[in-house]
């Protein structure tokens, strides 16, 4: 890619990246991105990004560089894309508290969500998740909301999930909220 192509690719994103350098909030939502351009990471290289919103794009993967470069992330919104997997590097986001991966193409919960030590809000609604490994422990002791609405959870798994003792609020379809209080 020559310099002119890089500049053309970056023009609409440059003001957003400059604003993020000042605020710590990178908002690239609804930018018609099919990839997160590497030049974004170059511009943001010395910035401390605490929040990143790349929702409403056309992404089918998240570059591992996001997790490697944005170690201070507390909030990541990757909803409304075409994602089915996440890079393993995302499991190393030590400060991540809120992860929104709703309205994507996930058939299973990515293993990394169980490894995030400070995760308190996980939004995974409107995917294609039918079940996941209930024996895998959630590393975070701060989990507050786990939203699985509008997923085709199979009935036997749903029963196991509802009966599993949790300290967090489990949200499932219109049937209500389960495990809202410690039992």
Language-model-derived ranges and their functions:
Residues 1-79, 85-88, 98, 130-183:
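The feature captures the LRR N-terminal capping module
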Residues 82-84, 88, 92-97, 105, ...:
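Tandem repeat domain/solenoid detector
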Residues 100-101, 107, 113-129:
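Extended, charged alpha-helical interaction scaffolds
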């Amino acid at each position: 890619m020559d310099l002119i192509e890089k500049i053309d690719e970056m023009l609409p994103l440059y003001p957003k990246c400059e604003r993020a350098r000042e605020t710590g909030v990178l908002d690239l939502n609804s930018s018609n991105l099919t990839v997160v351009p590497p030049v974004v990471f170059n511009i943001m290289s010395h910035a401390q990004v605490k929040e990143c919103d790349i929702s409403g794009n056309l992404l089918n993967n998240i570059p591992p560089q996001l997790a490697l470069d944005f170690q201070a992330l507390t909030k990541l919104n990757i909803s409304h894309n075409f994602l089915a997997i996440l890079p393993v590097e995302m499991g190393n986001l030590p400060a991540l508290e809120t992860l929104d991966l709703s309205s994507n193409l996930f058939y299973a919960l990515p293993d990394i969500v169980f490894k995030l030590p400070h995760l308190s809000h996980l939004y995974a609604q409107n995917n294609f998740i039918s079940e996941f490994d209930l024996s895998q422990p959630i590393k975070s002791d701060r989990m507050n909301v786990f939203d699985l609405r509008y997923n085709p959870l199979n009935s036997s798994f749903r029963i196991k999930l509802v009966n599993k003792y949790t300290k967090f609020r489990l949200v499932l379809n219109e049937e209500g909220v389960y495990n809202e209080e410690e039992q």
